[in-house]
Amino acid sequence: MNKVFNFLNNLNINNHGSGHTEPAEGFQDFMLAWNFLHINSINGIISLAFVSLIVAIYLIGVLRLSKTNFLVPSKLALISVALFLLIFVLEGPIDFFAEEMFFIHMIQHLTLMVVIAPLLLSANAMPIFIWGTPKKMRSTLSKPFAGNSTSKKILSVITRPRYSLLLYIINLYFWHIPYFYNLALAHDTFHFINHVMYVFMAMLLWWPILGPAPVRTNLTIPQKIVYVLVAVTPSAALAAFITLSGEPIYNYESTPLHWNMLSHSEDQTWGGIIMWLPGNFVFLGVLTTLFFKWSKQEESTSLPKLEN
């Protein structure tokens, strides 16, 4: 445990594989390790453009919808948190070191799947981002989800519990096959696709629970509880396999140990533990919330009606 806690005290951005030359000497420097602060490479320029575009679209969308009843403060808070986390894990310190430390990479992926995706769904963020685009593009983006369009019909199918769960599990296991995991590590294009697929499939996973527009969920609370229990099992099994495998599975052994804290096997073990425990705690929290809602619902229906 002390090895993990000492990580931030032994960082060395000077040795980072992306060509950065600034030394890092602890938590403060870790928090300053943002990709777009290092625009001496094409990746740094792309990162800066990516962050700027997302923030601009969001702010324009909020401005255009500010005089409507759609913008609820609680929704804006959820979207803002999700957007900050998205930028932090994809462009900030987490991404900066994710390609060299497996357990940090796992933190990145878990944040995308079990935090950011459900936050965006809970806030029904899509309309704000659509309204942040130019008029012609806005019309093009909104048409596929209106009326009985083909896109809406497809969405209604893939968000059904049996399909959303299956697609999520297939995607999760696919990207943890060593060949494809290592491919994403080695090539930025595949890594980008990897992150997009994680977020998209995670949204499908959470859709039957949260059910935002344009396709509402029709699951009862007991059905949602069963769904979450089924969903958590495959990810827990994968986490257990990674944790208990012993020998390194992925290509982190080709990366020099810059900080001399964790061996590659220990790094992988901690990554599996992070996937196993914090990841499952999110599902446990959802289950607890659903149980309380179910209990309250049952209590309200079982109370005798008072006669006038």
Question: What do the predicted segments below correspond to?
Answer:
Residues 2-308:
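Alpha-helical membrane segments of multi-pass proteins
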